[in-house]
Amino acid sequence: GVPGPNGDVGPAGPTGPAGLDGAPGAQGPDGEPGLPGLPGQSGKSGASGQPGVPGPVGAAGKPGSIRGQPGPPGPPGDLGRPGERGAKGVRGTPGAPGVDGVAGIAGAIGFPGPMGPDGAAGPSGYPGFDGVAGKPGPQGAMGPKGQAGERGPQGTPGTQGSKGVVGPKGVVGPQGDSGDTGDAGQKGARGTAGSVGAKGTVGLPGNQGPQGPAGLKGVKGEKGEVGDKGILGPDGDKGPTGMSGDAGPAGPIGDAGIQGPPGQDGPTGAQGPRGGQGPKGPAGAVGDVGDRGSTGPAGPPGPPGPTGGGIILVPVNDQNPTRSPVSGSVFYRGQAEETDVNLGSVADVIELHKKLQHLKSPTGTKDSPARSCHDLFLEDNSTSDGYYWIDPNGGCIGDAVKVFCNFTGGVQQTCISATKNAGDLKSWSGHSIWFSDMLGGFKLTYDISRSQLQFIRAASRHAVQSFTYKCRNSAAAVIFRTQDNKEIAANKVTYDGCKSRPSVPDAAFVAVETKRVEQLPIRDFASSDIAGQHQEFGFEMGPACFY
């Protein structure tokens, strides 16, 4: 038949079991930002970073309102250049007498002096104390064979020895002497001849016979062996006092003592004998132009002139009369021929005039050198310190020399410098203490001729030269070799930072001041405290100044 209508919905069935997990869905869109989280705990300190590069120098800050404490004294600065000459001040009032200065520091240890002469023999010394007994000496060598000694006395009988062992059977002794004839026996009956009997045994030895005569002297026996070393005998008696020994050799030269204070000036010596005539001096400078001389007398009449060609009438009113050298005479000048002027001669005269002016008023330039810095100052006392040209021998200016003029302190010093005047702070090696003989050393030379130097000395009464000794682990024990090949020490110490042999670089500032101007400038120097390990030195030689 036809299907009937749908029935009513039935009641819900029981819940089925859970299904299997589905596949992961696609990623959803980003959510909204969450709220800020709470602050985290502080982390551990990181490792220190590398030092950053130095930043740029900041701008100078404003002056503080509080004055800072004075800083520690800085190290000694380098020796500065002489400052410019200041204006001459007014004369001050005499000051009060100064207090006595403190004693100067002890000078550096000097070099060992020369060995002195042998001293006179001293008096004999007191007898010395008894010496202790000496140790036994070593066994001596075997002496030579001695002579045979005399026969000694007979010794005492020895004690009876123990019974000896039975000796081996002795050999048959010699036949004994015939015995005494026995008493005649009774005649026996004749027996039958018997067989030969066996040999009888040796009889017992007989008693010892009397001592025989002494035998002949035996031959000398061989030398016996060296006996054992004897025991040490008792100490001998004290011997008599020995004679004084010879003087011992001179001991080594002791270290030089510290330099003593300068002695008092000695009395003026007697006038020396008159010296021999010196060598001819150089030509003097060209003198100033002299004043015009007076008119000389009229000369003799000249020889007759050639015959003229007739009388020339000259108007009386000629406007060119010329005064004759002879007083009261007038002659008239004719028409002279034109002549060429030698312009070269005029230039020479002008040049000579300039040279004369330079000689009269030198300016210290290469074309106008002065004799010395002193002369330059006399020409213009406002001249400041600096380098100038001088020509001490006053000859051709081609050998003029450039020097430093020091006008500070009221003296006019002419100073010349060494062409190479410094050495670095380092260890110097060599077999000599003189700097010029060391590896890399050199002699101090000066760019000035001997002639010019002699004229500078001749015009000077004093000379001074400074020296800077740079040190590390070395004391400034320095001597100098002068131009006349003498050895001198510094006699002025401004500062000595080397006396304690510092392990860090330091310096000593010394100088040589002398009235023996021929000793300067210094040509070499030596240091006696450079032989140890880690010792270094350097130097700077200042200019030699004459005044």
From Swiss-Prot:
The modification Allysine is found at K187. Residues 343-547 form the Fibrillar collagen NC1 domain. Residues 272-281 have a biased composition (Gly residues). Residues 219-228 have a biased composition (Basic and acidic residues). GO terms for cellular component: collagen trimer; extracellular matrix; extracellular space. Residues 337-547 form a propeptide. Its main location: secreted. Keywords: Collagen, Extracellular matrix, Glycoprotein, Hydroxylation, Repeat, Secreted. The keyword Transmembrane helix does not apply. Residues 1-99, 116-311 are annotated as: Disordered. InterPro entries: Collagen, Collagen_superfamily, Fib_collagen_C. Residues 1-280 are annotated as: Triple-helical region. Glycans are attached at N381, N406. GO terms for molecular function: extracellular matrix structural constituent. Residues 27-69, 160-175, 246-271 have a biased composition (Low complexity). It is found in: Secreted, Extracellular space, Extracellular matrix. PANTHER family: COLLAGEN ALPHA, COLLAGEN TRIPLE HELIX REPEAT. Belongs to the fibrillar collagen family. This is Collagen EMF1-alpha. It comes from Ephydatia muelleri. The lineage of its organism: Eukaryota, Metazoa, Porifera, Demospongiae, Heteroscleromorpha. The gene is COLF1.
